[in-house]
């Protein structure tokens, strides 16, 4: 609490005693008036002695009020800890602060102990300049400390002031001094309390240091980059690639363009300008007496009745006038006369007799000039100062006035304009619409509607993109591009066995991947980036794209080093669509609304959608991206350059599934001229390269034969003889040189003879040819053989390309579907004259049954084309949906469970025949039992037939051999046994043949006997029907009754109505 000082006994005349009294706490309320007297004399009771340098504090209440008017300054000078407490609403008489929640105060200052009676204490260290400031209410606000009963809070680290505490305020009550919410309490003079206060201050400073600078260590420099908050701002050159910027496209573009002043000045059209005042002479007169409609002509005399001299002035309200400012601005000023104080050009031209008629750009003649009136230029300074200028002689309209709505009339009445135009002002129409109206004799503008609704040009699919191959592919580098591919590679086309060249028990050690940076390939062509085969290895850190084909045998596949592009085709949603979306992988190509599909008529790119596509010069196919499992890695093997196998284990960057491939070019056939000429060209390429490396320009056949292992010496010699000449004598005897008319091509010209795509197509043809040979050797089903031949590469590519040109139709569905479940296209050819049948229709199984024998059309062309297009769309979207599924693969829990996907596998033969095998087997009692087995699986039946045919071939070989040459006794016994078996079979066949002839001969007797055995009831029917069949010689036997001469569907059968006959009516 603050002690109140009464009338002290201290002698204030002494300066030292006065200061001791002040710092001793006797001036608690700062009522210095009790010590220092007022206006009354020294003899008064209330007289107080003043210090020599005392300051008057009478107006301290007014000063406090003035300080309240400066909230910003007071808030700025407060301590930060005080700022968090908020403004004090009120203070009661007991000094309690009102409007402050204790909970909120404790939250803001957790380190301060005590109740709500927290006070602000001023301390003095005794030696700081702040001592006098604190005394005379001029202390710095930063020196204010927040204190409790036990300690002092100093957020700014200020020094202590004095040994005692002062209370600031002008209101005393209950031993408290309150001013603006600041409550001051005198400090105790106890030494222990001071030490505790200093200790609390030190602890609080350590707490603040640990809170705001947790990484602070004594003797180390702080890392201000981590402590100071920095706002993350992108660089000005940085652009987000993933974010698709939406372009700003206003729908209604209407720009108001101001007319060019130069054109208006030089034009001959009528302009709307301000009128010109005239003096004694007329300044301008209208060439036309007609006035515009809607204008009321009022003279100045009616508006302003002024002096006679001013009455002579008239306002010419004509639309063909020129403003005065414009005349002055465009006049030719005589600078010499102006500088020499001569007569101005305007004054000189005032005389109409000396002035010739002037023509302006509008075509009007100026008959008189403006008369310079001296009265208009005589201004009185007093009138200007007193704002008593004379009134304006005409109304002034400010075009920029917001309260005025000015509209310019635009008359489209051509007849009225023609009347106003004089014969001297007739000019040629310069407007484009007027010129078109003059020559618009056939109403050409009416035909413009057809041009708007009809699009004259539709882009025929994106032009062929440029595909750049690597240097090894362009060079057709061996052994990657062989002239003759071995059979084992053709049978495993692009599916080489990974462990074929690895010895069993080999220890695999993974090598480290080679680092390949993007800077190395930046700005380079494909030839430069992949100049050698080492650059094409997968054993580096370059990203890898795995393309898994959905077909078992694609139409054509790229070889080593050939380039492919991943194109993201995007079709515009409408004509105003300017969006160009970009996927993380691939090159974006935008298709117009009317552009054709990149898949011709067998695929679709919907408006506003993206279809990623694998693009090269041989095929096009849609691709579908899939997520890669975190447990999947790629194991690769690399060999070459005299180094053993090296193994690499790396992650997979991108995984795609390739849909059905659509061929771009036709695969040549085995005996086509294209293949024959390519073989000859390939031979020339090899010879040219050998000659370019040989200085003598002569070679032998041996280095050429290495590239053609399937040809002998004579075949190579015959082909080389076409363009080379054999040297029979001379130093080059036995060698071959080019003929005189043959030119040796350099290596660059040799590379252009054959492209890598042609080599890939020939290899695809070779693979199909090898498959055909294997099919003929191991496939015994004639129907399946013919189907496989129709599905060879050169057949299906020809069918597809003809169908894209609308010269043929393909089946779309059926046995030629590579998926086997209706999710792919069948490229088998079908007839365009009613041959196409929609899937699921009953006529799709047997097309020949619906064909009519007449010459009339049994189909509708429009309906067939509609069904054809619908089937294409159905197959395309089914194909897309199936390959887009990203469900994880589920292993079969029960391997014996029937898989529903095998429902299309045949379980019966087409001819409905089964195999019956009768085997003799002894049972457990030693008795021979007959065991009959029926086999219906066509594949098992085919296997048995193949074994039987093989045994027959072995028998024939054994029988053809001469017995005299057989030295082995076992072979003789085997041959004897085979001969006996063959003889028994021949005897059985002879007996069956004889029995068949006897049955034909005795057919009548047999029929009679059978009729008697069947009973008397059936005999009457038989006899009645027999008369009808008399004279017919037939050998047909009924399956129900066994009689000859009819079948079971014939009503003449005696058992036709019996239950055993399946043909009988039920």
From Swiss-Prot:
Report which reactions are catalysed by this protein: L-lysyl-[protein] + acetyl-CoA = N(6)-acetyl-L-lysyl-[protein] + CoA + H(+)
Source superkingdom: Eukaryota
What's in the keyword line of the UniProt record?
Acyltransferase, Chromatin regulator, Coiled coil, Nucleus, Transcription, Transcription regulation, Transferase
An example of a GO molecular function for this protein is:
RNA polymerase II general transcription initiation factor activity
The similarity comment for this entry is: Belongs to the TAF1 family.
Instruction: List every stretch annotated Disordered.
Output: 836-856, 989-1036
Q: What is its main location?
A: nucleus
GO biological process, alphabetically ordered:
positive regulation of transcription by RNA polymerase II; RNA polymerase II preinitiation complex assembly; transcription by RNA polymerase II
Subcellular location as annotated:
Nucleus
Q: Which organism is it from?
A: Saccharomyces cerevisiae (strain ATCC 204508 / S288c) (Baker's yeast)
- Spell out the coiled coil positions from the record: 409-425, 944-1000
List the biased-composition ranges (Low complexity). Answer: 839-856
Written domain comment of the UniProt record: Compared to higher eukaryotes TAF1, yeast TAF1 lacks the C-terminal bromodomains and C-terminal kinase activity. The TFIID interacting proteins BDF1 and BDF2 may substitute for these domains.
Cite the InterPro entries for this sequence.
TAF1, TAF1_HAT_dom, Znf-CCHC_6
How does this chain assemble? The 1.2 MDa TFIID complex is composed of TATA binding protein (TBP) and the 14 TBP-associated factors. One copy of each TAF1, TAF2, TAF3, TAF7, TAF8, TAF11, TAF13, two copies of each TAF4, TAF5, TAF6, TAF9, TAF10, TAF12, and three copies of TAF14.
Question: What is one Pfam family matched by this protein?
Answer: DUF3591
Which E.C. number(s) belong to this protein?
Answer: 2.3.1.48
Q: What is the protein name given in its UniProt record?
A: Transcription initiation factor TFIID subunit 1
Record's GO cellular component, any one? transcription factor TFIID complex
């Amino acid at each position: 609490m603050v002690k109140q000082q009464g009338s002290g006994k201290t002698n204030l005349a002494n300066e030292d005693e006065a200061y001791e009294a002040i710092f001793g706490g006797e001036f608690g309320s700062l009522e210095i008036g009790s010590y220092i007297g007022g206006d009354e004399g020294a003899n008064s009771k209330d007289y107080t002695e003043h210090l020599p340098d005392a300051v008057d504090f009478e107006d301290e209440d007014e000063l406090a009020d003035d300080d309240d008017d400066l909230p910003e300054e007071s808030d700025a000078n407060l301590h930060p800890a005080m700022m968090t407490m908020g403004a004090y609403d009120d203070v009661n008489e007991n000094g309690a602060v009102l409007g402050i929640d204790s909970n909120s105060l404790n939250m803001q200052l957790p380190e301060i102990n005590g109740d709500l009676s927290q006070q602000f204490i001023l301390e003095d260290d005794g030696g700081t300049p702040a001592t006098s400031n604190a005394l005379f209410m001029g202390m710095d606000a930063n020196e204010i400390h927040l204190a409790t009963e036990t300690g002092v809070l100093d957020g700014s680290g200020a020094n202590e002031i004095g040994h005692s505490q002062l209370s600031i305020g002008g209101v005393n009550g209950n031993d408290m001094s309150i001013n603006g919410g600041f409550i001051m309490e005198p400090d105790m003079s106890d030494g222990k309390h001071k030490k505790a206060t200093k200790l609390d201050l030190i602890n609080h400073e350590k707490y603040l240091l640990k809170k705001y600078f947790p990484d602070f260590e004594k003797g180390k420099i702080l890392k201000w980059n981590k402590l100071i908050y920095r706002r993350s701002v992108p660089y000005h050159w940085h652009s987000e690639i993933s974010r698709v910027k939406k372009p700003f496209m206003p729908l209604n573009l209407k720009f108001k363009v101001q007319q060019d002043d130069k054109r208006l000045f030089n034009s001959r059209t009528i302009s709307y300008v301000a009128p010109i005042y005239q003096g004694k002479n007329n300044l301008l007169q209208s060439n036309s007496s007609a006035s515009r409609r809607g204008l009321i002509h009022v003279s100045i005399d009616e508006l302003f009745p002024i002096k006679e001299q001013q009455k002579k002035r008239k306002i010419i309200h004509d639309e063909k006038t020129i403003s005065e400012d414009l005349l002055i601005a465009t006049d030719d000023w005589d600078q010499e006369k102006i500088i020499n104080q001569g007569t101005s050009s305007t004054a000189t031209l005032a005389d109409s007799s000396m002035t010739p008629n002037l023509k302006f750009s509008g075509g009007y003649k100026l008959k008189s000039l403006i008369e310079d009136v001296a009265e208009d230029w005589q201004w009185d300074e007093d009138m200007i100062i007193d704002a008593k200028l004379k009134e304006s002689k005409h109304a002034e309209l400010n075009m920029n006035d917001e309260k005025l709505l000015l509209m310019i009339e635009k008359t489209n009445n051509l007849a009225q304009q023609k009347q106003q135009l004089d014969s001297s002002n007739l000019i040629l129409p310069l407007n484009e619409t007027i010129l078109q109206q003059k020559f618009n004799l056939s109403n050409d503008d009416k035909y413009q509607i057809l041009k708007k609704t009809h699009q004259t040009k539709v882009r025929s699919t994106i032009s062929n993109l440029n595909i750049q191959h690597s240097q090894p592919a362009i060079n057709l580098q061996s052994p990657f591009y062989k002239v003759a591919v071995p059979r084992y590679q053709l049978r495993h086309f692009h599916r080489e066995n990974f462990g074929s060249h690895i010895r069993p028990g080999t220890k695999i050690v993974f090598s480290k991947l080679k680092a390949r940076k993007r800077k190395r390939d930046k700005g380079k062509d494909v030839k430069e980036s992949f100049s050698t085969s080492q650059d094409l290895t997968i054993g580096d850190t370059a990203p890898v794209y795995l393309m898994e084909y959905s077909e078992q045998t694609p139409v054509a596949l790229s070889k080593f080093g050939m380039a492919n592009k991943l194109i993201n085709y995007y079709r515009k949603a409408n004509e105003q669509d300017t969006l160009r979306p970009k996927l993380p992988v691939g090159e974006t190509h935008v298709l117009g609304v009317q552009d054709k599909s990149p898949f011709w008529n067998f695929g679709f790119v919907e408006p506003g959608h993206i279809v990623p596509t694998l693009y090269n010069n041989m095929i096009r196919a849609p691709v579908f991206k899939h997520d890669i499992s975190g447990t999947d890695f790629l194991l690769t093997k690399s060999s070459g350059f005299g180094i053993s196998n090296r193994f690499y284990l790396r992650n997979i960057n991108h995984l795609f599934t390739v849909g059905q491939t659509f061929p771009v070019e036709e695969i040549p056939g085995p005996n086509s001229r294209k293949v024959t000429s390519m073989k000859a060209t390939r031979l020339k390429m090899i010879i040219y390269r050998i000659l370019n490396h040989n200085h003598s320009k002569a070679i032998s056949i041996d280095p050429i034969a290495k590239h053609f292992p399937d040809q002998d010496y004579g075949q190579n010699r015959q082909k080389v003889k076409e363009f080379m000449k054999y040297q029979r004598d001379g130093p080059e005897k036995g060698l071959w040189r080019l003929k005189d008319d043959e030119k040796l091509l350099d290596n660059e010209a040799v590379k252009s003879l054959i492209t890598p795509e042609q080599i890939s197509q020939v290899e695809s043809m070779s693979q199909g040819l090898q498959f055909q040979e294997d099919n003929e050797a191991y496939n015994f089903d004639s129907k399946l053989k013919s189907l496989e031949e129709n599905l060879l590469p050169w057949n299906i590519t020809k069918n597809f390309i003809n169908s894209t040109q609308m010269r043929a139709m393909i089946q779309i569905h059926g046995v030629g579907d590579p998926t086997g479940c209706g999710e792919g296209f069948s490229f088998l050819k079908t007839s365009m004259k009613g041959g196409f049948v929609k899937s699921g229709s009953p006529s799709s199984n047997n097309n020949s049954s619906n064909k009519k024998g007449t010459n009339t059309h049994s189909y509708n062309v429009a309906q067939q084309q509609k069904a054809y297009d619908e089937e294409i769309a159905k197959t395309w979207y089914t194909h897309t949906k199936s390959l887009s599924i990203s469900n994880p693969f589920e292993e079969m829990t029960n391997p014996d469970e029937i898989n529903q996907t095998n429902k299309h596998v045949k379980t019966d033969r087409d001819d409905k025949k089964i195999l019956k095998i009768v085997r003799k087997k002894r049972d457990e009692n030693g008795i021979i039992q007959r065991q009959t087995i029926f086999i219906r699986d066509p594949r098992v039946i085919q296997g048995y037939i193949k074994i039987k045919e093989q045994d027959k071939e072995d028998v024939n070989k054994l029988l053809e051999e001469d017995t005299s040459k057989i030295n082995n006794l076992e072979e003789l016994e085997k041959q004897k046994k085979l001969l006996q078996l063959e003889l028994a079979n021949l005897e059985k066949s002879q007996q069956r043949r004889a029995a068949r002839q006897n049955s034909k001969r005795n057919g009548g007797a047999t029929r009679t006997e059978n009729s008697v055995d069947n009973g008397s009831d059936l005999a009457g029917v038989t006899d009645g029907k027999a008369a009808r069949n008399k004279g017919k010689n037939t050998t047909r036997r009924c399956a129900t009754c066994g009689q000859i001469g009819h079948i079971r569907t014939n009503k003449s059968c005696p058992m036709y109505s019996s239950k055993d006959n399946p043909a009988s009516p039920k």
